[in-house]
Amino acid sequence: MHSKFILYLSILAVFTVSFAGGERFKEAPKFFNSPECLTIENDEDFVCSDKAIHVAMTLDTAYLRGSMAVILSVLQHSSCPQNIVFHFVTSKQSHRLQNYVVASFPYLKFRIYPYDVAAISGLISTSIRSALDSPLNYARNYLADILPTCLSRVVYLDSDLILVDDISKLFSTHIPTDVVLAAPEYCNANFTTYFTPTFWSNPSLSITLSLNRRATPCYFNTGVMVIELKKWREGDYTRKIIEWMELQKRIRIYELGSLPPFLLVFAGNIAPVDHRWNQHGLGGDNFRGLCRDLHPGPVSLLHWSGKGKPWVRLDDGRPCPLDALWVPYDLLESRFDLIES
């Protein structure tokens, strides 16, 4: 009886250290380039390599499990995984987060960049969901300022998605010379719902969406974007987004976090990407996060935008059917894994 009790305490101690002290992740396999890939192994600074595929993401403890799944899915489906360079933006605990990444992906090419939360916090207005108010959710606004000036193009990815196709196809999206970013557009969405009656009733504001636009403004999801960083810097687009955020602090013109300023600046002026690259909304709406089905058509990227995240629903024992597609990319060690180790 005494020995069983000691064994129980030992197992409990393992759980306490591993789960209360932080999540523990498995090491991912190493992935190798196909023979036709150019090599960046000999580049003095892979961070600036023009032969690399550059991916930008945010990294924090709340979404770390999702971020690890994104990384694995990108590498697993890439024909040139050794040519992918990740650029992680983080607001705090960067050393701890770096250790997690290195432990699971020892061969990953990446760099971590600090993000000044204090500089953005005063510009954030409350939205319909608290997760949308996180300062790190606004880091995409500042990528051109945070990342090295040697970078000309980057794919930005949220932490609640997985790829099931080669990211090089997305990275090589054609972007016209007078366009700054590319993303899947959804012109059947009711664009008016993204802004308040105050916005639409003020002609000096609402006319913004009809001035200097290449096409009719349409909704696009900012969780998957191909961004031309040099064009962004040349056009001073960070300042343009900040101006709308400053106005929002004085007059409430939208409700949905970091998305509306992007729409105000870029909608109608983006390069469209095939919808297969953002099967979004799998997290349900922003209030209940109910289960949803895939949109019709082929799929290259699954995106759990909305309130419901697959890892949360799985842990709660209430997964949606499509959450099963996320599970193979989950690197979190189960309690069984921990006991066996």
Curated annotation (Swiss-Prot):
Pfam family, one: Glyco_transf_8
EC number: 2.4.1.-
Cellular component terms (Gene Ontology): Golgi apparatus; Golgi membrane
Cytoplasmic side: 1-4
One of the record's GO molecular function terms: polygalacturonate 4-alpha-galacturonosyltransferase activity
Keyword Signal among UniProt keywords: no
Keyword tRNA-binding among UniProt keywords: no
Signal sequence region: none
GO biological process: cell wall organization; pectin biosynthetic process
Top-rank EC class of the record's enzyme: transferase
Similarity-based family: Belongs to the glycosyltransferase 8 family.
Protein name per its UniProtKB record: Probable galacturonosyltransferase-like 2
Organism: Arabidopsis thaliana (Mouse-ear cress)
Gene: GATL2
